[in-house]
C-alpha cells in the first residue's frame, strides 16, 4: 500500500490459543481492545487490554493532568497515548496514536464491537476498524457479525483523503461443525463460523486468493487448520466461496499435535 499503509495480517500459533475462527490454536486478526477478564468482567470498570501488530498489554490510566479518558500501555511499545472517545452512535470507542502520528481506531462502528444485544453500552470487545497516518493514507476494516461474534469481512487499503481505497482483501466464512460458546457477563458469544477462503483484489481485479482447509481432531472433534493454498489471479470461486480452479502453488501444510 501507499507508504506502507497496508494490513499486517499474520497467522500466529499459540498452544493456549483456544479454538478461534481459523481452528484450534491459531490466531488471525488485526487487533482489538478488550475488557480485562483476569478478575471477571465489570462493565463499569475501566480495565482494558490492547493488542495490535503483535503488541499486547494492559491499558492504564494516564497520570494527571491527563483526562480520565486517556490511557497508556503498560509495556514499552509504539503507542504514545490511547484515548477513550464517544462514537457517533453515543457508544465508547478507542483511538491509539503511535510515535509517528498514525492513529488506530477500535470499535468506532457498531459492527466492529462484541456487545450485549440487550444493551449497546455493554461492550466486551472493540475490533480495529481504521488506521490512518499523518499524510491521510488510511485503511478500513469491516466485520461480519454472527451470534454476537465478529469476524473479519473486508480490509480496504491504499485510500487517501477523499480517494477510496483501491486494494481490498475479502474473507469468506463457512459453518463449522465444532461451534464454540464463550460466556461473558450478561450474554453469550458463539463462534459458529470459520475462515474458508480469502480474495485479494487491486483496482477491482483479483491479484491472488487463498483456500483454507481443516481436519477434525480425532480426540476432540475440533477444527484443526490443515493447509493454506495460494492461487493466482485466475482463481475461480464457486457460489459458496470455495476455489474451484486457478494456478495453484503447493499448499502449505500445518501439521501439529492436537
Task: Name each model feature, range by range.
Residues 1-258:
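Conserved catalytic cores of ATP-dependent inositol ring kinases
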Amino acid at each position: 500500500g501507499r507508504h506502507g499503509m497496508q494490513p499486517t495480517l499474520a497467522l500466529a500459533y499459540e498452544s493456549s490459543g483456544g479454538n478461534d475462527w481459523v481452528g484450534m490454536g491459531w490466531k488471525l486478526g488485526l487487533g482489538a481492545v478488550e475488557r480485562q477478564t483476569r478478575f471477571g468482567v465489570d462493565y463499569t470498570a475501566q480495565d482494558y487490554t490492547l493488542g495490535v501488530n503483535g503488541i499486547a498489554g494492559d491499558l492504564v490510566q494516564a497520570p494527571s493532568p491527563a483526562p480520565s479518558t486517556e490511557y497508556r500501555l503498560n509495556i514499552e511499545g509504539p503507542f504514545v497515548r490511547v484515548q477513550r472517545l464517544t462514537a457517533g452512535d453515543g457508544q465508547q470507542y478507542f483511538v491509539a496514536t503511535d510515535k509517528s502520528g498514525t492513529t488506530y481506531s477500535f470499535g468506532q462502528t457498531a459492527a466492529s464491537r462484541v456487545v450485549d444485544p440487550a444493551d449497546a453500552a455493554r461492550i466486551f470487545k472493540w475490533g480495529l476498524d481504521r488506521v490512518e497516518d499523518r499524510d491521510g493514507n488510511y485503511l478500513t476494516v469491516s466485520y461480519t457479525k454472527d451470534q454476537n461474534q465478529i469476524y473479519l469481512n473486508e480490509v480496504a487499503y491504499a485510500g487517501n483523503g477523499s480517494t477510496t481505497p483501491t486494494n481490498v482483501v475479502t474473507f469468506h466464512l463457512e459453518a463449522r461443525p465444532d461451534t464454540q460458546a464463550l460466556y461473558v457477563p450478561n450474554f453469550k458469544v458463539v463462534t459458529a463460523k470459520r475462515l474458508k477462503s480469502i480474495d485479494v483484489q487491486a483496482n477491482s481485479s483479483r491479484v491472488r486468493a487463498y483456500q483454507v482447509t481443516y481436519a477434525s481432531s480425532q480426540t476432540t472433534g475440533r477444527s484443526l487448520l490443515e493447509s493454506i493454498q495460494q492461487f493466482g489471479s485466475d482463481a475461480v470461486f464457486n457460489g459458496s466461496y470455495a476455489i474451484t480452479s486457478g494456478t495453484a502453488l503447493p499448499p502449505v501444510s500445518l501439521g501439529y499435535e492436537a
